[in-house]
C-alpha cells in the first residue's frame, strides 16, 4: 500500500433488520430489510451503542419548591463555596501538573514523563489474543455479493462457501467477521468429499457466537471436525456500505448537479472481515471465486477476468451477475472488487487497463503509458512472469491511502494515478510514476510472496518503496530518481528513527490498532533504506539473483525475514561476496530487530595516519543515548570512504565492517593530514557520520572552493544533513554545522539544496518566535541569492526534472521569507489569473509555479483571494489541482479564514473529502499562525474528529501528527500532556504518533534551551 489509510451494525427481531451507523451519533436514515437477526447480535454492545438518542422524550416530573429566604441562603452558601474553591485552586493548582511532570518548580530542567503515559497495559484490548486458531484453515472461497448503491439503502447482501482444511481435531470453526449480520439460521457445515456417489455429511451446529472484541465469529459443533479432512462452511450475511473508506465502502462524485455513487473495497490490513466472513490473516492464503451482482448500467471489476456473459439476478430485474475466474492462492487483504459507472482505456494487447470517471479518463493515459512498461521491466528484473492474466488500475474519488496493491486490481486516489499535461505539475507526474511503480512491485513482494504476519510488513512495503525508484528509473531515466532516494526517503526517515519512541523494522504486533500503527516511515522508508544498503554491499547482481531465488522458493506462500536472509546468504556465498563465516542474517538482524540507527564518529590521528571509528545510537535528545533497552545497540556497519586525493565516490562495496563492535581502528591508511576524508560513499549506509573538528574544517574549506563539486552531489547533500542534525542532537557545535551551509551561496544542484531545506525547516520552526529570527531570514536569503538568479521565476518545459524541483523549492523559501521579486511575481501572476475570463478553463500560471503563486498570493491577500481559490477548488476536475489548492488555502494569515477552513474539514458536504482532511490540517499546521489553531482544534474537537473519521484510519494518524508538531515551549507541552492524559486509550492507530509527538516536543524544548544563544551569536556574526 502506498502511503505511508466506522463501523456499522444491525438490529431487528425476526424478519426486520434496521440499519444504523452505530459509531456516529448523528441521525441516519434507516432501512427495513427482510432478514433475521441472531439473539447474540441483538444483545451485543454495538447494538446498544446505536440507540438513537433523538428518540428520548422529556415530560414534567414531580419536584420541590424553594422559598425566597431559602433561595437567598442557598445563594450565599454558593458564593462562599466559590471563594473557598478559588483559594484552594490558587494555592494547589501549580503542583497539580505533578501528574504530568515530576518537578513543577524547575520545569525547564525536569525529567519529562510523556513516555510514561503510553504503556501497552493501558489498552486492555491490546492484551487480547486476536490470532485465529490454527486448527482450521481455508482452502478456497466462493463469494457472492449484491451491493445496493443508493441513498437510503447503502447495504450489501452476501453469501460465502469456504472450503476448510482441518489440521488438528477441533470442535469449532473460528473466523473473522465485523460490522455485519450473519443469518445463523442459514449457517451450515458439511464434511466435504470429492466422491460424487457419497453425499456430504452435515455437521450439527450447537452454537454461533459473535466475539466482537476479537472480531471473531465462532461456530461450535457437536461432532469433532477430524484432522486431515475437509469441510464446507456456508454463511449468509448482510453488511453496510460505509463511508469510512475501509472494508466494502461507498464513494461518490458529481456530474453537474447529479451525485453518482460507486462501491469499492479497501481491505489492508484487517478489513476484509468487514466485507465477508473470512480467515483474515495474511498467511492464510486461499483461492477465491468471486461473483458480483451489479445494476445493468454499471460495471464490476475484481482481481481476475470476468468469465461468460452477465447472468440475471432472480428477483432483481435491474441487476445482473458478473462471475470471475478462480484466483491464484492469495491473502484476504488482497481481494478487491468495485462496482462503478467508470470508463476504461486499455493497452495495445488489452491486458493492462485503466479506469476513472468518464470526465477524468483521459488523465489516466500517462498511467496507461508507463504501467505496462514497468510491469514488463519487473518481469525481467525478477525473472518471474506476472502470474495473472490482466492488470487493472482504478482512480477512486475517495480513498484513504495513496494506493493499494490488490492483486490484479490496483486502486488509487485520483492524485496518485491521474496526470493532466498542462495542468498537473512535474512533481504530480513523478508521484503518479512512483505510486504505480510501487504498487506493481507489490505484485511480487507482498502478493506472490506474503509476510506470514504483519510483524514483517517491511518485507512488503520496504521492497516496494525501494523498487519504486528502480522501476521509475527504467521508464524515466532523465529524472535521476535513484539519486533522489537519499533526500526523499533516507533523510526523511532519519528524523523519526532518532526518537526513542521509534520501533524496530520487524516488530511484534497483534491488535488491529497496533498493526495500523506500523504503516509508517519505518516500515516504508527505513526498510527501503536498509534494502538499498544491501543492494550495495552485496552488489547488484548478487542482490537481484538472491531476490529471484527467494521469490521462486516462496511463491504463493508466506515468508518471514529469515527466508529472505537465507536466499541472499546462499547467493552471496556462491558468488564469494561474503565471507563463508558471515551470513546476511548476522548483518541484517542488527538493522531489523533493533530500534534506531548509529552515528559513526570518525577520529583521525593526524600523526600516525590511523583512524578510530566508534558507533553509538543516534538520538535527538541532545546527545544522550539513554534508551529503554538495558543493552546498548550495536550494528554491523558497512564502512566505505574516500579522500581528497582518491576522489572515488563510486566504490560502494564496503572496504571494512564494524561487526557489531563499539569501535575499530584502521591503520596504515597513508592519508595526507592536510586532506579531508569522507565516509559513507553515496550515503548507501543507513547511518550518520561525525568527524573530529579538524576534518570538518577541511571539508568546509573544500566546500568553499570553486572545486566544491569534487565532492559528489549525494555526499554534499549528506554533509549538510549530517552536520545540521548532529548539531541538533548536541553532537556537533552549531557554529561548525552552520559553517557547512555557507557554501550554499554557490550551490545550484537539487540534492544539496533539498537536504538544506529539510534540515533548515527545523531551524525555521524553532526560531520563528524568537528575536533572532530576522537574522536567520536574512542569512537564508543571502544563500538563496545566486541560485534564485539561476533558476528564475519562469518555468521552461525543456528544463530537467531536478532543475524544476530546485526552482520550486528555492521560490517557495524565497517567497516565504519575503523576497521582494519573488512575492511581486507571485502576486502579479495570481492577480492576472483572477482577471482572466473563465479562470477555470484558462489558467495562465505555469503548472510548476502554481504552488508558490497560490500560497504566496493567499498569504499576502485576504478574503477575496481565498474565496477565489476556494471556488477554483470546487470547480476543477483535476485531482492534483484540487490538492494544490487545498494546501494553498491553508497559507492565509487571516485567523478567521483558517478557523472556518478547519471547521469545513469535518463538515459533511462542505466540498472537502474525508481522504483530504490530513492535507488540510497539514497545510494549516505548517502556517505559523495556523499551528496553534490546529492544536486547539484537535483538543476542542477531539470527540467530533473521532466520530467523523474513526480511530483506526490513516487519516487520524495524519491529523495527530500535523496538529502536534512544532511544539517547543513548556506551556504548550503541558497542554499536550494534559490532552493526552485526558484521552489516553482513545487514539487507536494514532497512539504511536501521539507518543512520538510528545517526545519530539520534549526534544524541541531542550533544543531551544541548549542552542538559542549559540545560533543567535553565529547569525549576528554572519549577517553583519
What are these regions (language model features)?
Residues 22, 262, 324, 351-626, ...:
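Hydrophobic alpha-helical and helix-loop surface patches within well-folded domains
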Residues 158, 265-270, 277-437, 466, ...:
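Hydrophobic helix-coil surface modules that form long, contiguous segments used
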Residues 165-181, 289-295, 621-640:
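Surface-exposed beta-strand/loop patches in extracellular or lumenal glycoproteins
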Residues 181-254, 316, 664-671:
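A surface-exposed beta-strand-loop module
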Residues 490-491, 527, 612, 629, ...:
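Long, ordered, helix-rich scaffold segments
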Amino acid at each position: 500500500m502506498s502511503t505511508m489509510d466506522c463501523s456499522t451494525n444491525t438490529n431487528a427481531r425476526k424478519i426486520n433488520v434496521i440499519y444504523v451507523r452505530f459509531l456516529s451519533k448523528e441521525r441516519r436514515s434507516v432501512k427495513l430489510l427482510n432478514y433475521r437477526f441472531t439473539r447474540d447480535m441483538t444483545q451485543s454492545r454495538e447494538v446498544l451503542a446505536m440507540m438513537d438518542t433523538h428518540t428520548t422524550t422529556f415530560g414534567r416530573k414531580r419536584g420541590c419548591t424553594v422559598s425566597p429566604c431559602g433561595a437567598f441562603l442557598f445563594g450565599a452558601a454558593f458564593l462562599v463555596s466559590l471563594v473557598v474553591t478559588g483559594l484552594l485552586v490558587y494555592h494547589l493548582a501549580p503542583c497539580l501538573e505533578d501528574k504530568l511532570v515530576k518537578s513543577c518548580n524547575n520545569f525547564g530542567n525536569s525529567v519529562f514523563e510523556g513516555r510514561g503515559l503510553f504503556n501497552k497495559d493501558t489498552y486492555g484490548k491490546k492484551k487480547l489474543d486476536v490470532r485465529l486458531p490454527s486448527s482450521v484453515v481455508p482452502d478456497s472461497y466462493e463469494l457472492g455479493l449484491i451491493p445496493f448503491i443508493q441513498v437510503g439503502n447503502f447495504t450489501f447482501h452476501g453469501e460465502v462457501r469456504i472450503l476448510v482444511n482441518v489440521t488438528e481435531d477441533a470442535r469449532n470453526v473460528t473466523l473473522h467477521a465485523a460490522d455485519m449480520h450473519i443469518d445463523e439460521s442459514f449457517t451450515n457445515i458439511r464434511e466435504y468429499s470429492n466422491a460424487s456417489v457419497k453425499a456430504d455429511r452435515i455437521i450439527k451446529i450447537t452454537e454461533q457466537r459473535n466475539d466482537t472484541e476479537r472480531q471473531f465469529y465462532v461456530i461450535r459443533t457437536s461432532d469433532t471436525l477430524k484432522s486431515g479432512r475437509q469441510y464446507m462452511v456456508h454463511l449468509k450475511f448482510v453488511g453496510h456500505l460505509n463511508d469510512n473508506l475501509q472494508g466494502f465502502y461507498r464513494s461518490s462524485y458529481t456530474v453537474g448537479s447529479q451525485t453518482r455513487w460507486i462501491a469499492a473495497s479497501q481491505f489492508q490490513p484487517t478489513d476484509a472481515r468487514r466485507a465477508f466472513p473470512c480467515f483474515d490473516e495474511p498467511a492464510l492464503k486461499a483461492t477465491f471465486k468471486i461473483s458480483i451482482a451489479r445494476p445493468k448500467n454499471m460495471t464490476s471489476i475484481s482481481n481476475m477476468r470476468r468469465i461468460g456473459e452477465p447472468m440475471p439476478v432472480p428477483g432483481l430485474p435491474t441487476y445482473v451477475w458478473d462471475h470471475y475466474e478462480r484466483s491464484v492462492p492469495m491473502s484476504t487483504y488482497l481481494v478487491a472488487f468495485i462496482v462503478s459507472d467508470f470508463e476504461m482505456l486499455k493497452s495495445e494487447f488489452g491486458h493492462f487497463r485503466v479506469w476513472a470517471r468518464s470526465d477524468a479518463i483521459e488523465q489516466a493515459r500517462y498511467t496507461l503509458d508507463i504501467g505496462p512498461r514497468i510491469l514488463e521491466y519487473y518481469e525481467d528484473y525478477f525473472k518471474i512472469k506476472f502470474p495473472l492474466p490482466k492488470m487493472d488500475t482504478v482512480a477512486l474519488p475517495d480513498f484513504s491511502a495513496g494506493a493499494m496493491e490488490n492483486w490484479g486490481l490496483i486502486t488509487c486516489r485520483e492524485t496518485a494515478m491521474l496526470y493532466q499535461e498542462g495542468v498537473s505539475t512535474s512533481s504530480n507526474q513523478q508521484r503518479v510514476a512512483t505510486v504505480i511503480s510501487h504498487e506493481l512491485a507489490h505484485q511480487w513482494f507482498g502478493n506472490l510472496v506474503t509476510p506470514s504476519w504483519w510483524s514483517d510488513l517491511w518485507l512488503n512495503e520496504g521492497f516496494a518503496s525501494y523498487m519504486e525508484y528502480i522501476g521509475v528509473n527504467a521508464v524515466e531515466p532523465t529524472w535521476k530518481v535513484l539519486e533522489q532516494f537519499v533526500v526523499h526517503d533516507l533523510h526523511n526517515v532519519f528524523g523519526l528513527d532518532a526518537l526513542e519512541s521509534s520501533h524496530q523494522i520487524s516488530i511484534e504486533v497483534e491488535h488491529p490498532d497496533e498493526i495500523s500503527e506500523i504503516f509508517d516511515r519505518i516500515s516504508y522508508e527505513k526498510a527501503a533504506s536498509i534494502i538499498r544498503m544491501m543492494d550495495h554491499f552485496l552488489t547488484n547482481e548478487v542482490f537481484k539473483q538472491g531476490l529471484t531465488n527467494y521469490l521462486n522458493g516462496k511463491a504463493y506462500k508466506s515468508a518471514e525475514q529469515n527466508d529472505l536472509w537465507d536466499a541472499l546468504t546462499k547467493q552471496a556465498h556462491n558468488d564469494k561476496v561474503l565471507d563463508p563465516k558471515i551470513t546476511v542474517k548476522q548483518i541484517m538482524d542488527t538493522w531489523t530487530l533493533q530500534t534506531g540507527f548509529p552515528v559513526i564518529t570518525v577520529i583521525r590521528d593526524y600523526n600516525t595516519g590511523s583512524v578510530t571509528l566508534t558507533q553509538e545510537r543516534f538520538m535527538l535528545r541532545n546527545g544522550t543515548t539513554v534508551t529503554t533497552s538495558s543493552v546498548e545497540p550495536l550494528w554491523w556497519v558497512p564502512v566505505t570512504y574516500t579522500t581528497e586525493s582518491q576522489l572515488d565516490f563510486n566504490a560502494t562495496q564496503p572496504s571494512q565492517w564494524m561487526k557489531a563492535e563499539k569501535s575499530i581502528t584502521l591503520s596504515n591508511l597513508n592519508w595526507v593530514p592536510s586532506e579531508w576524508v569522507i565516509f559513507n560513499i553515496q550515503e548507501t549506509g543507513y547511518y550518520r557520520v561525525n568527524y573530529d573538528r579538524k576534518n570538518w574544517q577541511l571539508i568546509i574549506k573544500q566546500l568553499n572552493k570553486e572545486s566544491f563539486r569534487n565532492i559528489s552531489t549525494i555526499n554534499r547533500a549528506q554533509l549538510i544533513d549530517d552536520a545540521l542534525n548532529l548539531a541538533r542532537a548536541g553532537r556537533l557545535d552549531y557554529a561548525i554545522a552552520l559553517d557547512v551551509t555557507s557554501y550554499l551561496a554557490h550551490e545550484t544542484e537539487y540534492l544539496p539544496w533539498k537536504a538544506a531545506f529539510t534540515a533548515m525547516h527545523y531551524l525555521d520552526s524553532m526560531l520563528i518566535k524568537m528575536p533572532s529570527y530576522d537574522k536567520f531570514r536574512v542569512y537564508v536569503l543571502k544563500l538563496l541569492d545566486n541560485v534564485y538568479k539561476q533558476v528564475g521565476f519562469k518555468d521552461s518545459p525543456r528544463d530537467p526534472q531536478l532543475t524544476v524541483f530546485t526552482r520550486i523549492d528555492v521560490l517557495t523559501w524565497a517567497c516565504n521569507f519575503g523576497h521582494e521579486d519573488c512575492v511581486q511575481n507571485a502576486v502579479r501572476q495570481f492577480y492576472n489569473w483572477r482577471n482572466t475570463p473563465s479562470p477555470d478553463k484558462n489558467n495562465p500560471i505555469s503548472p510548476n509555479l502554481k504552488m508558490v503563486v497560490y500560497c504566496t498570493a493567499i498569504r499576502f491577500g485576504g478574503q477575496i483571494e481565498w474565496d477565489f481559490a476556494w471556488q477554483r477548488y470546487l470547480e476543477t476536475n483535476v485531482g492534483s489541482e484540487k490538492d494544490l489548492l487545498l494546501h494553498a488555502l491553508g497559507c492565509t494569515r487571516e485567523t478567521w479564514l483558517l478557523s472556518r477552513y478547519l471547521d469545513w474539514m469535518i463538515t459533511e458536504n462542505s466540498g472537502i473529502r474525508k481522504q483530504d482532511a490530513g492535507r488540510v490540517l497539514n497545510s494549516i499546521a505548517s502556517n505559523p499562525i495556523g499551528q496553534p489553531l490546529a492544536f486547539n482544534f484537535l483538543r476542542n474537537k477531539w470527540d467530533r474528529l473521532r466520530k467523523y473519521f474513526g480511530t483506526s484510519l490513516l487519516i487520524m494518524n495524519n491529523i495527530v501528527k500535523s496538529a502536534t508538531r512544532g511544539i517547543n515551549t513548556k506551556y504548550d507541552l503541558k497542554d499536550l500532556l494534559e490532552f493526552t492524559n485526558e484521552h489516553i486509550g482513545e487514539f487507536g492507530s494514532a497512539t504511536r504518533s501521539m507518543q512520538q509527538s510528545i517526545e519530539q516536543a520534549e526534544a524541541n524544548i531542550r533544543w531551544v534551551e541548549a542552542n538559542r544563544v549559540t545560533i543567535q551569536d553565529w547569525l549576528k556574526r554572519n549577517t553583519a
